[in-house]
Amino acid sequence: MRKIIHIDCDCFYAALEMRDDPSLRGKALAVGGSPDKRGVVATCSYEARAYGVRSAMAMRTALKLCPDLLVVRPRFDVYRAVSKQIHAIFRDYTELIEPLSLDEAYLDVSASPHFAGSATRIAQDIRRRVAEELRITVSAGVAPNKFLAKIASDWRKPDGLFVITPEQVDGFVAELPVAKLHGVGKVTAERLARMGIRTCADLRQGSKLSLVREFGSFGERLWSLAHGVDERPVEVDSRRQSVSVECTFDRDLPDLAACLEELPALLEELDGRLLRLDGSYRPDKPFVKLKFHDFTQTTLEQAGAGRDLDSYRQMLGQAFARGSRPVRLIGVGVRLLDLQGAHEQLRLF
């Protein structure tokens, strides 16, 4: 049985700003771009979240929700330096580390000799060292696989530790809302709810075949997750080729106008994912993906195109013209240039 730890820094960028400037502590704080230049929130303090402010939100919107919000420009050089320090701590316990972003990573400690192989004690020690050496907090989840470790790290945020033992997996997953499953967004969760499926226990009542018929290959993934199964390894050398966001709609979108209405929300989520990349990547070619009602699909990307709403609207229009029929799924994304540690800064757009 594997022992996986998921570590997630608590409001990482904001935490570092508050660490380095104590006058910001306890205040509604957002790190991000200027509201006058269509900036977005990279992250925010928990005080700001109480007002509804969240990552990837337009800064103008955030200021409407919280007029007293303090806006701080990001210092990516500081964030990257601290991220490297955190990873150096990780390497004292295992070399099997899969970074997900500057502030998040999976660790496989199955073969670690530290603390007699106790993943829980390793996670406790990592949290202690980060707090003492770097003066910020991290949350940790311990479980037999990546899917559950990630859920566990969020269970007692901020500054928390949650452990799911192999013996607890079945009961824990059974009570889990399907909205917690990786890949289940708002639309899919609502679709499942209309089928009478709200928890993983509900998912287990049906057959795998029925899920595949309803959701395609994702149905198989749903079935596995509902049973607490996730065989994905911790990928040490994993490098991203792209970042994207997709949404499958409960009802097919009948025309281009309906598709265009969905773009802003998708791009907002894409912005949030791009902001979490580390400095070894640079966004390059934007692309859109459409899956039509008959399950045929097309992808269109354009070198040199911008990553703004108008550019994606144009690409979406061109992609739609290839089929000119109802749309089941829209995806938006960006191909990445792998800089392997080059010191380039992501643009907050």
Curated annotation (Swiss-Prot):
Its main location: cytoplasm. Keywords: Cytoplasm, DNA damage, DNA repair, DNA replication, DNA-binding, DNA-directed DNA polymerase, Magnesium, Metal-binding, Mutator protein, Nucleotidyltransferase, Transferase. It catalyses: DNA(n) + a 2'-deoxyribonucleoside 5'-triphosphate = DNA(n+1) + diphosphate. GO terms for biological process: DNA-templated DNA replication; error-prone translesion synthesis; SOS response. Its EC number is 2.7.7.7. GO terms for cellular component: cytosol. Its cofactor is Mg(2+). Pfam families: IMS, IMS_C, IMS_HHH_1. It is found in: Cytoplasm. The active site is at E104. HAMAP family: DNApol_IV. Monomer. This is DNA polymerase IV. It comes from Pseudomonas paraeruginosa (strain DSM 24068 / PA7).
